[in-house]
Structure formats: structure tokens, C-alpha cells
């Protein structure tokens, strides 16, 4: 962030000297299987991951989290403009209601005053009639069959939260998993973690800069 450039080898040397171990991603596991191969489900987003304003494109996905008591499932919605996680829900099942709850949280928190695309895979939760009703005023976009790269940003986030945080713990149960996710998202990822996409600002800071610049431009325009 301060403009210092060093090689990966130098970073590795410093990490060894400081006793810091790298965090590795565990093998990817499928949580939602494509359930609708209809050609009616179009990939409107088409890997255009850099919208020019907030609330232009949201993307959503579900990932599993291992606990001693059994798996729990994290549903997240990301605003692609800032890579901010604008809503999330942790559940003990993969029912469609978990996705709907997350969408309702996002709609309550964000000001949707222009066309909005919401992108997901073709899992059963995202093609259900309840999902279509919850997103009836949005443009629904779907990844191609068995092609997770079409939803790369949210897939990457779920990998990051596990690699950087959750994999450090032997999580006991739902309650501990919820606490850990809350701490990471609300006290770090959205507020402090810098992102190259955001010009090395946090998602919250990136959105604040946009709002300030946008407001100033409107004032100058009269």
C-alpha cells in the first residue's frame, strides 16, 4: 500500500525469520450442483467483473464449513464494484430459504435505484421459484454448466476466508463458526483488508471514495 515492491522469495525469507507459516487452501468441494441446464438461463454477466458503480452487479454463492458437529453452510452476496460482502447467512442446511434470507438482507441494506444484475451458479437454490420471486426486479445471470470461473470473484472470496482465517481453527459448532465469520467480515474483510481491485483500499473505503467523488461531480454539474 505504501508502494514498496519486494519479491515473493524475500517475503518467504521474512516469514521464516518471523516464524510465520503460509496458509494453504484445502481441496475444493462442491456444495451446489448444477440442477438446471436450460439454455434459458443466460450468462448475462459474461465474466465482466468490474462494474463502474455500486449495485450494478451482485454475485452469490454457497460454501461449506467443517465443524466438529457437522458441516454448516455460508451463503454470501458480493457487490462486484467494491468486492464488499453486502450480506451473508450461516445455516445448518442447504435449503433455498438461506439464499432468500441473504437476498432480503442485501436488499434492505443497499439502495437499488438502477438496473441490477445478480449472478450465481445453476444450483437448485438459485433456480427455485422462491429465488426467482425474491429477485423479480433484478436481471438474473447464471454461470455456464460446470464452469465455476464464471463466478470467480465470490468463489475466490470463499477460498480466502477459509485460507486466511477459518482453517486456523478447529471449529466446534455453528455458534463458533458464526462468531469467526462475523469477526472476519465485519471487523476485517469489509473494513480493513486491502484489495488490489480497490486500488489497495478496503471495500468500505473504496465505496466511500466513490460516493464522495460522485457527490462532488454532481455538485459541480449543478
Language model region names:
Residues 136, 160-222:
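C-terminal domain-tail junction helix/linker
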Residues 22, 139-140:
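Hydrophobic beta-strand scaffold residues
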Residues 11, 15, 45, 61, ...:
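Mobile genetic element proteins and their domesticated derivatives, centered on retroelements
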Residues 31-35, 120-122, 128-130, 142-162, ...:
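RNase H-like two-metal-ion nuclease catalytic core shared by retroviral integrases
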Residues 2-3, 49-50, 67-68, 122, ...:
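Conserved, non-catalytic sequence blocks in retroelement Pol enzymes and Pol-derived host proteins
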Residues 66, 70, 88-112, 127:
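Active-site beta-loop-alpha junctions of metal-dependent nucleic acid enzymes
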Residues 47, 51-86, 92-93:
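An active-site-proximal beta-strand-loop segment
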